[in-house]
Amino acid sequence: EGLLKAVRSLETGVCHIYHKKFDTMSNEGILAYIRKGTDDRIYAIAELIRRGVDLLHVYDNTKIDLFFLEKLKNIVEMENVVKANVGDVEVLRDAKRMGFSDKFIGQCWSMNQSEVFLMRKANNIFPVYKMIDTCAAEFNSDVPYLYSTYEEENESIVTDRKKIIVLGSGPIRIGQGVEFDYSTVH
């Protein structure tokens, strides 16, 4: 989930670990491309996995640990499940838990992003908010830094305090860093 959120947060217009520029490249061309670390290498690696290239071969060309390559493979395998099960609510729920965007699911299902959202809404598939453990479980900390996820338990505590909304963009934006977000709104 985190990886796909990170890809979307790059604000490059890409909503998934897919980039069309690798569609027409040969496997050999992509293997040569991934030998060097670039800002779009992850898309090239995902394309090789889609094509069934063995992860050990990808490892040999990137030296990226197999643990991480397996995580990319899990995402690619879920892409196949999504494409094969158009409109399936449980697949939608699982895809959201893996971090798939409504836009990408819509592309797989020949729907637009709004239609996927409405399907989620009709089936009560919404994000919940989890608390970030800022102390790595070393000791208890009640700092209300939250992130959204499609898991089950919501750790957000609703209060009766007055609410505000912060609008705008610039050097410090909401979502840039949790410590900045928190100081901006408290």
Q: PLM features: residue spans?
A:
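ATP-dependent carboxylate/acyl-activation modules
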Residues: E1-H186
